[in-house]
Amino acid sequence: MNAPKLADPIVLAHGMLGLMQGLVSGARMENYFRGIPDWLRKAGNEVIVTHVPGIGSIARRAEMLKQGILASTNRTVHLIGHSQGGLDARHMITHLDMAECVRSLTTIGTPHRGSPIADWGVSTAGKAGIFQLIETTSLDTQAFLDLRTENMAAFNESTPDMKDVRYYSVTGVGNPKKMIATLRWCHKYIEKHEGANDGLVSTASAEWGEEVTEWPADHANQIGLFCGDHFDWKSHWADMLSRLQSSS
């Protein structure tokens, strides 16, 4: 299936690289989205794959996202952010004077209302696991703190949508039997606290904007990883891009 061609450049904003390294051996910034950039370019799209700190606060990553976009184009863009990349984009648009540069923002599997995994990570029990691992490896712990549910509530209150930007979102509901082990454990934990989820982000947390689409995909499937024959990422990405095409 071919990708629809958009009139404006497409910017891809990645999520936590440290997380993806844990899920996918050898994951690097340039292949976070795997075959998606090439697929988009084959249809004639101008594609900008941004590079921001793999583990960093929303504010820090948003600054780098802005720099990456302005260094690549002077045209308005369609932004697509996966996971934390969607939060970086929202911060950038609202707080860094980038609303005039962005035609639309589509977030995929983005924890707009935080994550119970982040809450657990800074709890007494979690500090012996995830949070301690981040601290001992000298990574930016603010990234994890930003995603706590109470901190995201404050973020949402201080980061309103901008009126001239179209906001869309994609949520995911993954099949735990098809998930890799890490996502399977997280899926069970999140399901207990927030219900349906993609193995890292609940559908309730991922909903944002004027139109919400649900994919039968886990957090990795959404960017073309471990799809097998149970999720056709090209078909779903094509539908998403067709919506942007019609709203331009």
Q: What positions do the PLM features span?
A:
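Short amphipathic alpha-helices and their capping/turn segments at secondary-structure boundaries
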Residues: M1-L6, T94-D97
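C-terminal catalytic-base region of ester-bond hydrolases, centering on the histidine
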Residues: D161-S248
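Glycine-rich His-Gly loop
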Residues: H14-M16, Q21, H82-S83, T110, ...
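Serine-dependent carboxylesterase/thioesterase catalytic core
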Residues: A59-T159, D198
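Hydrophobic/aromatic beta-strand patches that form the interior of the parallel beta-sheet core
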Residues: V11, I48, T106, Y168-V170, ...
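Short aromatic-enriched loop/helix-cap "lid" or pocket-rim segments at secondary-structure transitions
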Residues: L23-S25, S115-G121, G126, K178-L183
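Histidine-centered active-site/metal-ligand motif
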Residues: H14, N45, H78, H82, ...
